[in-house]
């Protein structure tokens, strides 16, 4: 596609003479620009892309998209106050609107997105509906797997990944849709056929400012699904009604406590998994899963209702298939080589931590205790730090450590967390490896140890460097040293 065709009708001001030059790529990284590319001068937390516009030109950029006009640049400039949405518009057009060629399923919610998307993908694949996946752990485009750290990729990458899925003959894509991605316009010009709500609890107030704005961002996804599509809602979520009100498409519901189209009853929890009865219409079907905890029953229900309502497949067959599914990496990931069970989990919000600890508390032997290693990420929502401490304090003994401190001093983050404790039933160890070592050293055979906050992540982010660090690997190394 040439530049003149791409910019025709675009929602932005165009400066400079637009010529029919071939567009080869769109990118935010000036170092990756080559001849024929459009450079997206995005302003991030650490760097301003406008500072690298000259570098992009030197590398061969034929146009620059920005929120700021630069009169000293002799190149086509595409200017708009909402650069992320412009990036989405240009990228979707350049890649010929790939989401319209896929059955696009978006999953939003504070917690559970990764588990639900992985379950839906596994089920679709089992029904010979090959699907792609865009999520926190990885992006599966078909044959290729990409790990870039984004829950929802940047607009140019999102459209590029979707186009790759089309080329690799995927029928569907299941994607995590973050509140930030919705509020910023990152998923604009993406056509959603199905939207799924897991739950809405406190998170990302550093970005959204207020909880009401955060809820509104989540609810936006359901307004993007056309009447020909479908929305799937957890009716037990306190903010389900706001999402339902936003919907133009038919609503499918699931839940445990309240009335729903797909409902789980008779839930039995154990260390080996969960048993429950699925109630759908007149059908009552006994189910089992290796997933642990009541909160995971919600995740299972979200996947079951989405796939069953989409494919209209045999429900009993679907339940057999989901019963064989395993949790994603870093989601209550067990290490059973020591004297007591150790679990690695990504829980990094108060609600997620509460859900995990509720599930583990029910598995505790008499006289046992929960030992929880956790911290909070730097440069992120500070309001949840005290709340995280209060959650852990209700269930067991806390070992407070660093998570991904980013630009903040780890000691400052830990001190803010500890302001939330009412008692002195906690221990501070800033070094995460030493914190894990300490927790394992004090655990008895009747205890359960939870290493929370990082899950699948194999790194720690500090102010000036990112270092290799894997919670599960660290646990295994420490336990092996005891032998």
Curated annotation (Swiss-Prot):
GO terms for cellular component: cytoplasm. It is an enzyme of class 6 (ligase). Transmembrane segments: none annotated. Disulfide bonds: none annotated. Its cofactor is Mg(2+). GO terms for biological process: cell division; cell wall organization; peptidoglycan biosynthetic process; regulation of cell shape. Meso-2,6-diaminopimelate binds at residues 380, 403-406, 453, 457. Its main location: cytoplasm. Carboxylation is probably crucial for Mg(2+) binding and, consequently, for the gamma-phosphate positioning of ATP. Its EC number is 6.3.2.13. The modification N6-carboxylysine is found at residue 218. One of its GO terms (molecular function) is magnesium ion binding. A motif (Meso-diaminopimelate recognition motif) lies at residues 403-406. It comes from the Bacteria. It is found in: Cytoplasm. PANTHER family: MUR LIGASE FAMILY MEMBER, UDP-N-ACETYLMURAMOYL-L-ALANYL-D-GLUTAMATE--2,6-DIAMINOPIMELATE LIGASE MURE HOMOLOG, CHLOROPLASTIC. Belongs to the MurCDEF family. MurE subfamily. Catalyzes the addition of meso-diaminopimelic acid to the nucleotide precursor UDP-N-acetylmuramoyl-L-alanyl-D-glutamate (UMAG) in the biosynthesis of bacterial cell-wall peptidoglycan. This is UDP-N-acetylmuramoyl-L-alanyl-D-glutamate--2,6-diaminopimelate ligase. The lineage of its organism: Bacteria, Pseudomonadati, Chlamydiota, Chlamydiia, Chlamydiales. The gene is murE.
